[in-house]
Amino acid sequence: MKNKKHVNWWKELIRFLFVVYICMVVAVTLFPLPIGFPSSAENLNRSVNFIPFASIFKDIGQIGSAYDGDVLFMIGLIVRNVGGNVLLLIPLGFLAPIIWDTYKKIKNTILLGFTISVSIELLQLIESLFSGSARITDIDDVICNVLGSIVGYFIYKITLKLAATFNMQVVDKTNSKDIKCIDKS
């Protein structure tokens, strides 16, 4: 008899979605790689912000004056920037606890979100240093990204609670042989 392995398609689907998600994060945050001359110190100074909320408040302060006074355009830019940075790591906060037991604790998920976000910002800084790109390294992005991972984690917990309330089976663990139904922690 042939040795047949059972494939759990839900686990494989979640893992596949996670890989696709990581590829999309890399594509959105690091590509295209610009080819150009290294940035001058002056340009680099303008593309780094280590003061929390400084760029967000600066953008808010420019509503009505930047872009020829186009208020809606400026508000749209702020919403896209802040909202996009929050949305970026929501899937990480949702999927990490499903794939790895370590991230079932919120502090570990927050640390993962922080580590991923700081890594992205450092890679963008290196990109700016060596290619002359217009990428900005901003602590506000890190704050919004970490907030996104927290939101994703709470969506994960709410999903488990709703599934338990309605007696539904959910994929809660992809690193074991069997699907574990409902995490009651």
Regions found by a protein language model. Give the residues of each.
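A contiguous pocket-lining binding segment that forms or flanks enzyme active sites
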Residues: N145, S149
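Bulky hydrophobic segments
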Residues: M1-A134, I150-S185
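Non-cytosolic membrane-interface motifs at loop->transmembrane helix junctions
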Residues: S133-I143
